[in-house]
Amino acid sequence: MLAFCYSLPNAGDVIKGRVYEKDYALYIYLFDYPHSEAILAESVKMHMDRYVEYRDKLVGKTVKVKVIRVDYTKGYIDVNYKRMCRHQ
């Protein structure tokens, strides 16, 4: 699948999606951008004990997240849930 065939969000956008786990990281299926998924950046940097608690809290839920980085050539989208929670 070619990423540039689909529209991607911009850094700073707030988007909504459903959280799921893949390869010990949390990803979000984006409702507004079909065929796109984003990775929760903070889930990659966490210690395993904290990650398990975070995973149990979020997997399967629909959440709003803030886009922190987008690689338009590769189609990678990094989002942050914690930054979104601070602004609410």
Swiss-Prot record:
Q: What is this protein called?
A: Protein K3
**What does the entry give for GO biological process?**
symbiont-mediated suppression of host innate immune response; symbiont-mediated suppression of host PKR/eIFalpha signaling; symbiont-mediated suppression of host type I interferon-mediated signaling pathway
- Regarding domains, what does the record say? The C-terminus is involved in the inhibition of host EIF2AK2/PKR kinase.
Q: Which lineage do the record's taxonomy fields give for this organism?
A: Viruses, Varidnaviria, Bamfordvirae, Nucleocytoviricota, Pokkesviricetes
GO molecular function terms listed in the Swiss-Prot or TrEMBL record: peptidase inhibitor activity; protein serine/threonine kinase inhibitor activity; RNA binding
**What Pfam families is this protein classified in?**
S1
Family under the similarity heading: Belongs to the orthopoxvirus OPG041 family.
- Subunit annotation: Interacts with host EIF2AK2/PKR kinase.
Q: Where is this site: Involved in host species specificity?
A: 45
